[in-house]
């Protein structure tokens, strides 16, 4: 079994920054909205927009608006997360594992949790925590972006599709999720696609850019190992990594 020794006070996103990145960070801190926000969290927004200050400013403004509306802090720490939702392992990432291109690896398995069992705030708190705690990962990971492995086994459009987030964003006049949430998605591998996948992708085009849609690849489990070492992928997704998200979550300090 893999063991973890992650330190809640160690933010590796601050390590090995280039001179250009440090200069951009310094300029970004001059924006009024960035006042009192620690460098490690400002960097999450900057990396998401490749250090384009205006785009990063739009991102942080929208992100903070969502947090304000739902009364969610920046950062979110583990003890603010509903552990029951976390244990469903329907959406998560594990710090320290990368694909062959140096991207972080995230997992989605929507059928493991029913949206009606949790409030929108609980879902958003967990989602934002997953993003905020990525500040503990190295700067190189944030430069490279993320790869998502999504298993759609047993998904039901009636049980597992949640329109609350989309409705909430529209209500607040936020039409592009990439201008709300941090992170740069480089690839999405879809496993066990249902017959409803094409309608879902059509729906996704209403709030996701075509560039992102083009990065989605429907494949079998073994096909993902052309770009990800099998030892870096969890066993339940076809890899050989002897670890569960529950073990990982339980190993983290309460203020991580």
From Swiss-Prot:
Residues 82-245 form the CRAL-TRIO domain. PROSITE patterns: CRAL_TRIO. Gene3D superfamilies: CRAL-TRIO lipid binding domain (3.40.525.10). Pfam families: CRAL_TRIO. One of its GO terms (molecular function) is phosphatidylinositol bisphosphate binding. InterPro entries: CRAL-TRIO_dom, CRAL-TRIO_dom_sf, CRAL/TRIO_N_dom_sf. PANTHER family: ALPHA-TOCOPHEROL TRANSFER PROTEIN-RELATED, CRAL-TRIO DOMAIN-CONTAINING PROTEIN DDB_G0278031. This is CRAL-TRIO domain-containing protein DDB_G0278031.
């Amino acid at each position: 079994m893999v063991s973890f020794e992650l330190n809640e006070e160690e933010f590796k996103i601050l390590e090995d920054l280039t001179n250009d990145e440090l200069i951009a960070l310094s300029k970004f801190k001059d924006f009024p909205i960035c006042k009192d926000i620690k460098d490690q969290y400002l960097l999450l927004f900057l990396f998401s927009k490749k250090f384009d200050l205006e785009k990063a400013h739009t991102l942080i403004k929208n992100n903070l608006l969502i947090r304000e509306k739902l009364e969610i802090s920046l950062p979110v720490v583990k003890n603010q997360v509903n552990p029951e939702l976390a244990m469903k392992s329907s959406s998560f990432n594990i710090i320290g594992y990368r694909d062959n291109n140096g991207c972080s690896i995230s997992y989605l398995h929507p059928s493991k949790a029913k949206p009606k069992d949790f409030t929108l705030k609980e879902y958003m708190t967990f989602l934002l925590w997953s993003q905020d705690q990525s500040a503990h990962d190295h700067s190189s990971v944030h430069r490279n972006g993320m790869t998502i492995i999504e298993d759609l086994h047993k998904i039901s459009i009636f049980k597992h599709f949640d329109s609350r987030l989309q409705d909430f964003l529209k209500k607040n006049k936020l039409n592009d999720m990439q201008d709300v949430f941090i992170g740069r998605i480089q690839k999405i591998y879809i496993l066990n696609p249902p017959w409803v996948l094409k309608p879902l992708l059509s729906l996704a085009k209403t709030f996701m850019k075509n560039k992102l849609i083009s990065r989605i690849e429907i494949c079998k489990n073994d096909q993902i190992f052309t770009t990800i070492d099998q030892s870096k992928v969890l066993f339940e997704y076809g890899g050989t990594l002897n670890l569960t998200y529950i073990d990982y979550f339980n190993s983290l300090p309460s203020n991580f």
